Amino acid sequence: MAKPIYFEEHLTQAEMLEVKMKRQNLSIGILKETMPMENRVALVPASVAYLVGNNHRIVVQAGAGLSSHFQDIEYSEAGAEIAAATEEVYKCDVILKVAPPTLDEIEFFHPDQILISPLQIPLINSEYIQKLKEKRVTALAMEYMKDDDGSFPLVRIMGEMAGISAILTAANLLTATSGGTGVLLGGI
């Protein structure tokens, strides 16, 4: 018996082809922080090794990790390039900072560069925003980056660190050598 012919069988059918995404390797710059009392660094050597292992190029300004007790040799062994000149770091596609860049630092940025940093938006002025716009910099405020569950992981981590730091500072100030009574938990 003959099979019935359906009109749909003769229509042009869409074919799903696999499209390979071209993976873009990034160059990521880590600057030495210039804000007073800022001892943090944007990436630790272990994170650098992970990114380098995924074919990204990391350029670390010489001495960027010293305040956080990371030597340049540790970054170098993790696969980062150590740049003596700040200008070399600013040639990267992406700049990571722990503190917002100053107006002077924004001058070093080039068009279509990406800045990932806390921007402290409630504290910045229109001149700051205008300079970023003039430079055509895409600025991502770390403090507003959300996780899949809607939380702000960087804010949570910084809050935890601030809480631990407050306890340790208070304990230090309460010691007899710092002028305190030398009692950390009185009455217990």
Regions of interest found by a model, annotated:
Residues 13-131, 135-137:
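An N-terminal-biased, well-structured beta-alpha scaffold segment characteristic
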